């Protein structure tokens, strides 16, 4: 089995081991080392990914810009998954529901699930309902399946980790996936209610999914978990609940979300 085949089947640990062997055999092959960088990012091994990224020497004139983009993605993911920092909220100031979700995440990290439930319940109580279109299909009601992020869209831009409250989003256009890492961080164009627009990446896999089975780590499947009577959390691919019935729509399958 090749590393690409193992990755496609969600066998992430096997794919990493196979690709590490390939890089050991061909240490000067930039494509081989870049694929290892991508696999290590899925596996949550951000430091190792950054180390291998620095070792890539490519004659491609576009490589410096590509390397800079990879570094920014790794930096944003570190801030999302490992740094104890409140995300940027766009546009500011943060609405009450967004301000209450961050303490819930902090409470979960500190082992206080009951406090986390209180925070997410308080956030839900002041979250406005939004309506709009997902790929042209109208909806009334939109939320993330994970209580930690129920009312916000996670976005990476310029190495920063941000939340966009759904009521402050006007449109997000997810571009087609061109490489393996696009399955985790999809290039996107974001338009805010203020009229401001920017290019960034939308994470398609929940933070911490690298600790689960391979199919979840690479976003092929999603599972909702509540191991400690805390808020509902998800592992695997990002999942939206759309409309009054809460229809499950994988974010990776969306091309455009518009909010009225």
Named regions from a protein language model:
Residues 6, 40, 74-75, 107:
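Residue at a conserved register position within TPR or TPR-like alpha-solenoid repeats
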Residues 27, 61-62, 128:
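Short coil turns that delineate tetratricopeptide repeat
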Residues 19, 53, 119-121:
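Inward-facing hydrophobic residues that define packing positions of alpha-helical scaffold repeats
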Residues 32, 66-67:
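TPR alpha-solenoid repeat register
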């Amino acid at each position: 089995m090749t590393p690409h085949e193992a990755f496609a089947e969600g066998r992430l640990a096997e794919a990493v081991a196979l690709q590490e062997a390939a890089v050991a055999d061909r240490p000067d092959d930039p494509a081989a080392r870049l694929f290892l960088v991508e696999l290590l990012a899925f596996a949550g091994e951000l430091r190792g990914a950054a180390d291998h990224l620095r070792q890539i020497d490519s004659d491609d004139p576009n490589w410096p810009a590509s390397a800079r983009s990879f570094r920014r993605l790794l930096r944003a993911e570190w801030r999302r998954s490992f740094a104890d920092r409140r995300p940027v909220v766009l546009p500011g100031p943060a609405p009450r529901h967004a301000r209450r979700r961050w303490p819930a995440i902090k409470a979960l990290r500190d082992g206080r699930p009951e406090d986390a439930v209180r925070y997410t319940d308080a956030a839900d109580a002041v979250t406005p309902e939004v309506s709009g279109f997902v790929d042209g299909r109208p909806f009334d009601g939109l939320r993330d399946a994970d209580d930690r992020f129920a009312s916000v869209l996670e976005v990476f831009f310029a190495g920063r980790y941000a939340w966009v409250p759904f009521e402050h989003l006007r449109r997000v256009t997810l571009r087609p996936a061109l490489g393996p890492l696009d399955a985790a961080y999809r290039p996107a164009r974001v338009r805010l209610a203020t009229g401001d627009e920017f290019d960034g990446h939308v994470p398609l896999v929940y933070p911490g999914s690298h600790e689960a089975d391979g199919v979840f780590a690479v976003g092929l499947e999603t599972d909702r978990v509540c191991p400690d009577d805390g808020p509902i959390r998800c592992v695997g691919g990002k999942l939206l609940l759309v409309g009054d019935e809460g229809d499950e729509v994988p974010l990776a399958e969306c091309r455009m979300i518009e909010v009225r």
